[in-house]
Amino acid sequence: MMFLLPFLTVFLAKQSHTRTHSLRYFRLAISDPGPGVPEFISVGYVDSHPITTYDSVTRQKEPRAPWMAENLAPDHWERYTQLLRGWQRTFQTELRHLQRHYNHSGLHTYQRMIGCELLEDGSTTGFLQYAYDGQDFIVFDKDTLSWLAMDNVAHITKRAWEANLHELQYQKNWLEEECIAWLKRFLEYGSDALERTEHPVVRTTRKETFPGITTLFCRAHGFYPPEISMIWKKNGEEIVQEVDYGGVLPSGDGTYQMWVSVDLDPQTKDIYSCHVEHCGLQMVLEAPQESGNTLLVANTISGTIILIIVLAGVGALIWRRRSREPKEVMYQPTQVNEGSSPS
């Protein structure tokens, strides 16, 4: 198997059994929706999993995950259905006020995001912000009990909301305490789905995209959770510019996919390698020197990661442990506001 060594190197880091989790609620109001488009929508997520939904057409809060339906009684859904109907009226009124202040008519949107995160080290974060027509409008700072306004109209809202000290403290408490309590409860309800790990299948390919231009592609698919790091290196140095990234996208089967590519001169003697990190698993695949691909499949068996490498039709089984802890992988949250309990 020595002939494989120039093509790839595989590192295994000790697997971590903790990860960052988030609970987020989103609201959206639309001032002039078209036929069949709700005027108001509210959706809840744990990590990337939708858990609740409500809209102005159904006017019912409903579960989006089976483990939510199984663990929350019917009176929970009825109680928050009534609350959401009230929040719908309030949210649509706020949108009309903003349109008057901006002197706008026609189609406009108003969004709200609230949520919290439980980090790997046990610490927590909370976030609450609003957007108008997709642009940041006002953001809550729970540490200073104040609002950060993004324009002159937002300053009007800031003055009104900061006059209510009780509400400011209430939002802080919800973000720091109640939101985290609900998140922990939901993680318990959906542990089988939310705590699982599926490592990616990673493939590097080389193809001529234009005359004189060769593109290297590194593709990962079939992984969960969606947090992943993928970079290209040239002669051991990370390539920062001239790299194209595809976003982390759902595959439709509960897993995710992503790609990253880089162009090169086909006559170059430089060595290019794709570096992938996912839940403590670190993989380095050297790009093929000729048209073709390198495929790496990672599976977990009894706590030991087995890597099956298929290169040019030849299969090899390689495994190796490393005691080094994994680096932090990338994660980008978003945000919403939902009252004293999940909605």
UniProtKB/Swiss-Prot annotation:
GO terms for molecular function: beta-2-microglobulin binding; T cell receptor binding. 7-hydroxy-6-methyl-8-(1-D-ribityl)lumazine binds at residues 27, 42, 61, 112, 170-171. Residues 19-197 are annotated as: Antigen-binding cleft. Expressed in kidney, liver, testis, spleen, thymus, brain, and heart. GO terms for cellular component: early endosome membrane; endoplasmic reticulum; endoplasmic reticulum membrane; external side of plasma membrane; extracellular space; Golgi membrane; late endosome membrane; MHC class I protein complex. 8-(9H-purin-6-yl)-2-oxa-8-azabicyclo[3.3.1]nona-3,6-diene-4,6-dicarbaldehyde binds at residues 25, 27, 61, 76, 112. 5-(2-oxoethylideneamino)-6-(D-ribitylamino)uracil binds at residues 27, 42, 61, 112, 170-171. Residues 290-298 are annotated as: Connecting peptide. 2-amino-4-oxopteridine-6-carbaldehyde binds at residue 61. Disulfide bonds join 116-179, 218-274. This is Major histocompatibility complex class I-related protein 1. The alpha-1 domain is a structural part of antigen-binding cleft. Residues 19-298 are extracellular. The gene is Mr1. The chain crosses the membrane at residues 299-319. SUPFAM superfamilies: Immunoglobulin, MHC antigen-recognition domain. Glycans are attached at residue 103. It holds the Pfam family MHC_I. PANTHER family: MAJOR HISTOCOMPATIBILITY COMPLEX CLASS I-RELATED GENE PROTEIN, MHC CLASS I-RELATED. 5-(2-oxopropylideneamino)-6-(D-ribitylamino)uracil binds at residues 27, 42, 61, 112, 170-171. Residues 106-197 are annotated as: Alpha-2. Residues 200-302 form the Ig-like C1-type domain. Heterotrimer that consists of MR1, B2M and metabolite antigen. Major classes of metabolite ligands presented by MR1 include riboflavin-related antigens, pyrimidines and ribityl lumazines, nucleobase adducts and folate derivatives. Forms reversible covalent Schiff base complexes with microbial pyrimidine-based metabolite, which serves as a molecular switch triggering complete folding, stable association with B2M and translocation of the ternary complex from endoplasmic reticulum to the plasma membrane. Alternatively, forms non-Schiff base complexes with ribityl lumazines. InterPro entries: Ig-like_dom (IPR007110), Ig-like_dom_sf (IPR036179), Ig-like_fold (IPR013783), Ig/MHC_CS (IPR003006), Ig_C1-set (IPR003597), MHC_class-I_related (IPR050208), MHC_I-like_Ag-recog (IPR011161), MHC_I-like_Ag-recog_sf (IPR037055). Residues 198-289 are annotated as: Alpha-3. It is found in: Cell membrane; Endoplasmic reticulum membrane; Golgi apparatus membrane; Early endosome membrane. Keywords: Cell membrane, Disulfide bond, Endoplasmic reticulum, Endosome, Glycoprotein, Golgi apparatus, Immunity, Immunoglobulin domain, Innate immunity, Membrane, MHC I, Signal, Transmembrane, Transmembrane helix.
